Amino acid sequence: MAFTPFPPRQPTASARLPLTLMTLDDWALATITGADSEKYMQGQVTADVSQMTEDQHLLAAHCDAKGKMWSNLRLFRDGDGFAWIERRSVREPQLTELKKYAVFSKVTIAPDDERVLLGVAGFQARAALANLFSVLPSKEKQVIREDATTLLWFEHPAERFLIVTDEATANMLTDKLRGEAELNNSQQWLALNIEAGFPVIDAANSGQFIPQATNLQALGGISFKKGCYTGQEMVARAKFRGANKRALWLLTGSASRLPEAGEDLELKMGENWRRTGTVLAAVKLEDGQVVVQVVMNNDMEPDSIFRVRDDANTLHIEPLPYSLEE
């Protein structure tokens, strides 16, 4: 039987999150295997994959020739190649683009729906998992493999773990944690990624932004020293010529409805409102607060006031857990 996603509950901010086990059904896994895997990925993504160790995972972008991202990928070494996690809505088109040059290389690129993606976060997440695995990942060793399972460690917004495993292990983990952990779906993991300032690229925003417009340079996702990759010229120009005028921002506040990916917001200008930005993702938390991830000009005043279009409620800027200073 296929592993069934958990029913949804309103997400909670990291500071108040009880121990929670999540099914990450809005994310999807893909792999590249074969003798040329590393060389092939090195020519396709913004990160320097040749420098990646077995202990690392990182956020990289896969761009078109103009430097616009098809998707961003949470990348790690897997078997004799690599695996990555991205939003399910962009996986198929992203893989189609990635395969375009594969005919000339010894690689196999494929979606992986055999394995299950789970998230564990919240109060004493590490202690709960320590009973189930012999070793857990940490800041020094961010990827751990045990039998059929790969565990990825995340620091922000609070310590959490992403588990890539087979169906049998996923069922075992669910049975073991069911008594002490709340069960939730992808929306809770999405809320944590928004809070952490990790850009969320869904289908509506695929092919729209260069990596720096979503803060990827601040998240260690772009190497400016590696050799050629698709879109490199535009990505480099944005850095060295200051061509990038946008950044990813975190907004919180109230709204009578959740803005959708690809939608704009409105910025208060005196007595008027002016349309601005592009929403990447938004969630409503259990306390009623709305959290929005949006790409806007990178020179916004910190006390700016925003709203969902024509809404009576307002949103304001929250600091991200990393610096954009280069």
UniProtKB/Swiss-Prot annotation:
One of its GO terms (molecular function) is folic acid binding. One of its GO terms (biological process) is RNA modification. Its main location: cytoplasm. Pfam families: GCV_T, YgfZ_barrel. Folate binds at W27, W189. GO terms for cellular component: cytoplasm. InterPro entries: GCV_T_N, GcvT/YgfZ_C, tRNA-modifying_YgfZ, YgfZ/GcvT, YgfZ/GcvT_CS, YgfZ_barrel. The keyword Glycoprotein does not apply. Keywords: Cytoplasm, Folate-binding, tRNA processing. The keyword Glycosyltransferase does not apply. It comes from the Bacteria. It is found in: Cytoplasm. Folate-binding protein involved in regulating the level of ATP-DnaA and in the modification of some tRNAs. It is probably a key factor in regulatory networks that act via tRNA modification, such as initiation of chromosomal replication. Belongs to the tRNA-modifying YgfZ family. This is tRNA-modifying protein YgfZ. The gene is ygfZ.
